[in-house]
């Protein structure tokens, strides 16, 4: 699929009426439990940061209970081997901590370290039809971009596994990007069907109905105008140094029109760069484009490079410092797994009870 087709495929899944955006009022922060996560396939990039990472930190700082998942089993959906898994996992934790997630307040864990979470996959899979699994637009998109010769079974079932990620801790809010909305729909379907089929004796439902918490930032495209992705080589990593940042942005695609404007549908490449500078400067993209005016692509890129490097300097300094203590990163994961296991064990016991397994 071309990048343009990708955008269409993901955009066709509309937000559920109950989904929230980052600017919607949350009410009492302590009434929510938030879970979100990332695949440990490489460093997080600026799209992750503006799309979800900074919202997670905002939620944490508001006092919402946070679970942040390193989705290590999800890595083997579209590749045969989870390459350098431990290293990527630690680096993901590093990105989290550098961005401001605080392991004292947020539970950071890898789902392979939580057996009871994974066991929920079995009853959950029985609640979803094969036809539903094969219709998932995000899965279809990933299959189109996969380098594997054959599509494996996990590729079709991982959205149900993701439902287990969300439901094991009974999260009600899931901060995600637009492309994850089909998976949220799966989680809601699983929760609803499970509750209908297996209510508690007193009628109580086991699982809440999880809602997406969508970023208020417009989707940040990669340096080629397509979806920003570590695997597509069009992303600036959060922890990239200033020279690397400059090199990647200098190599970004632009167009022949010297006048810089913000027009995402007609000029995706130029608009992506304008948007990136605007997000870093906390200004409207129109104002940033206006200021560059007839300066052309060279002036635009200079502005973007400066804005990114300036905005991320403190985060990158913190990241470099944290990177010197790998033992601490592993300890964060151990502590997180301990908390997540206690919750997953309790949920699995409840699931087995309502199913009549004990
Ligand atoms: N699928 C998500 C991604 O690729 C990662 C993920 C796994 C996730 N489990 C999750 C996100 C649960 C939110 C909730 O980015």
Locations of regions flagged by a protein language model:
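Structured ligand/cofactor/substrate-binding pocket environments in proteins
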Residues: 44-51, 59, 65-71, 81-88, ...
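Conserved nucleotide- and phosphate/pyrophosphate-binding catalytic cores
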Residues: 6-10, 188-358
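Short helix-capping/linker segments at secondary-structure and domain boundaries
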Residues: 64, 130-134, 168-175, 278-288, ...
């Amino acid at each position: 699929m071309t990048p343009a087709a990708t955008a269409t495929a993901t955009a066709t899944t509309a937000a559920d009426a109950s989904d929230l955006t980052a600017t919607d009022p949350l009410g009492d922060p302590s009434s929510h439990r938030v879970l979100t996560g990332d695949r440990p396939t490489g460093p997080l990039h600026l799209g992750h940061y503006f799309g979800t990472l900074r919202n997670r930190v905002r939620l944490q700082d508001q006092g919402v209970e946070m679970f942040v998942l390193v989705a290590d089993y999800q890595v083997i959906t579209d590749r045969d081997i989870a390459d350098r898994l431990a290293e990527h996992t630690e680096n993901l934790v590093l990105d989290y901590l550098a961005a401001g997630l605080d392991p004292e307040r947020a539970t950071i864990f890898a789902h392979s370290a939580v057996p009871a979470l994974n066991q929920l996959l079995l009853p959950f899979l029985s609640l979803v039809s094969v036809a539903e699994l094969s219709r998932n637009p995000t899965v279809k998109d990933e299959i189109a971009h996969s380098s594997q010769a054959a599509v494996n079974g996990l590729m079709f079932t991982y959205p149900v596994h993701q439902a287990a990620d969300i439901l094991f801790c009974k999260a009600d809010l899931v901060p995600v990007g637009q492309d994850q909305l089909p998976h949220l729909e799966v989680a809601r379907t699983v929760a609803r069907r499970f509750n209908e089929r297996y209510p508690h004796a007193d009628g109580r439902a086991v699982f809440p109905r999880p809602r997406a918490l969508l970023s208020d930032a417009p989707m940040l495209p990669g340096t080629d105008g397509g979806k920003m992705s570590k695997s597509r080589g069009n992303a600036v990593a959060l922890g990239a140094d200033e020279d690397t940042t400059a090199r990647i942005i200098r190599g970004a695609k632009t167009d022949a029109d010297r006048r810089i404007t913000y027009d995402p549908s007609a000029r995706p490449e130029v608009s992506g760069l304008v948007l990136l500078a605007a997000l870093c400067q906390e200004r409207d993209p129109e104002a940033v484009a206006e200021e560059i005016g007839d300066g052309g692509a060279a002036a635009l890129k200079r502005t973007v490079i400066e804005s990114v490097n300036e905005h991320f300097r403190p985060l990158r300094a913190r990241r470099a410092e944290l990177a010197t203590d790998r033992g601490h990163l592993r300890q964060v994961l151990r502590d997180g797994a301990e908390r997540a296991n206690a919750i997953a064990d309790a949920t699995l016991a409840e699931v087995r009870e309502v199913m009549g397994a004990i």
